[in-house]
Regions:
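Conserved ABC ATPase "signature" region
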Residues: 96, 100, 107-125, 176
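Hydrophobic anchor residue at the start of the ABC signature
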Residues: 143
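A short, proline-enriched helix->beta-strand linker immediately N-terminal to the Walker B motif
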Residues: 148-152, 181
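Helical segment within the ABC ATPase nucleotide-binding domain
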Residues: 168-180
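Conserved ABC transporter NBD signature motif
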Residues: 56-67, 71-75
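Catalytic Walker B motif of ABC-type/P-loop ATPase nucleotide-binding domains
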Residues: 154-158
């Protein structure tokens, strides 16, 4: 379960997020909708522990993200608005690299990478440099890295940005199927 209580974030005197509270139960999908500048991405960055809140609490599976950031982050797969991919790496090479950083056991890395590539339909570009991929493929590589380590929670900031209409449908169906094993919070347009 993810619990957000009275979450507030100020930048100077401007409130990006003010007294936000909600709960996402296990195996639920919560979608954030709102105009640009409404604080959606700021909220995601606080939930994932990449940005401190001004006040309030974020609890991930019983762990306060500010008190136990390392343990809480191990349970989260995060796809930021702009995927953090290394442009000079090949797709499979990058995903194996990320799996290692996430602490996936060496004997499980290849299987997890293959599974993520299959789910995101990127096997056909596994040997290509990321810099040579379209925005849609880069987005799917970013989504694949979020799945590595088999996180219980997925935080997805606009996971369908840059995808063509058919890919949007595929990714939405994938997200629905992931619900059986994951709790998902996502920003969508």
């Amino acid at each position: 379960m993810i619990e957000i209580k009275n979450l507030t974030k100020f930048y100077g005197r401007n409130a990006a997020v003010k007294n936000l509270s909600f709960t996402v139960n296990d195996n639920e999908i919560l979608g954030f909708l709102g105009p640009n500048g409404a604080g959606k991405s700021t909220t995601m960055n606080i939930i994932t522990g990449f940005l401190p809140s001004t006040s309030g609490t974020v609890t991930i599976n019983g762990l306060d993200i500010s008190e136990n950031p390392s343990e809480a982050k191990k349970m989260i797969g995060y796809l930021p608005e702009i995927p953090p991919v290394y442009l000079d790496m090949k797709v499979k090479e990058y995903l194996k690299f990320v799996a290692g950083i996430k602490g996936v056991k060496r004997n499980e890395r290849n299987q997890q990478v293959e599974s993520a590539m299959e789910k995101l339909k990127i096997k056909d570009v596994e040997k290509r440099l990321i810099r040579n991929l379209s925005k849609g493929y880069r987005q799917r590589v970013g989504f694949a890295q979020a799945l590595l380590g088999d996180p219980k929670y997925l935080i997805l900031d606009e996971p369908t940005v840059g995808l063509d209409p058919n890919q949007v449908i595929e990714v939405r169906n994938l997200i629905k199927s992931l619900k059986k094993d994951h709790t998902i919070i996502m920003i969508t347009k």
